């Protein structure tokens, strides 16, 4: 991994890297995933840096999950999705590639 990957989300938060931002408040930011698995796949990222679930504070984790659910329910309704997956990868063996805690919200649609 290089510094670009490590700092990508911080750059998005600071508007130094382009992203389609869907939601932002003082604690989290949500934006479309550049490598989406499905239409509308987005990420919710805490602004306070932590590597993953092993290091995030309980307070930041609670806020992140509540906001991820709240925003997921809102977005899947807009998209016409019939369900969604909430995913958090932790460490390389679990396919974490950007080492800043984040939640994937992946909408699913009727087949």
UniProtKB/Swiss-Prot annotation:
Q: Which residues form a coiled coil?
A: none
Q: Name one Pfam family in it.
A: HIT
Q: Which residues form the HIT domain?
A: 8-111
Q: Name one GO molecular function term.
A: catalytic activity
Q: Which one GO biological process term can you cite for this protein?
A: nucleotide metabolic process
Superkingdom, according to UniProt? Bacteria
Kindly give the InterPro entries that the UniProt entry links to this protein.
Histidine_triad_CS, Histidine_triad_HIT, HIT-like, HIT-like_sf, M_plasma_HinT
Q: List the disulfide bonds.
A: none
Q: Where is this motif: Histidine triad motif?
A: 100-104
PANTHER family reported in the protein's UniProt record: ADENOSINE 5'-MONOPHOSPHORAMIDASE HNT1 (PTHR46648:SF1), HIT FAMILY PROTEIN 1 (PTHR46648)
NCBIfam families in the record: M_plasma_HinT
Put simply, this protein is called Uncharacterized 13.1 kDa HIT-like protein in P37 5'region
* Protein species of origin: Mesomycoplasma hyorhinis (Mycoplasma hyorhinis)
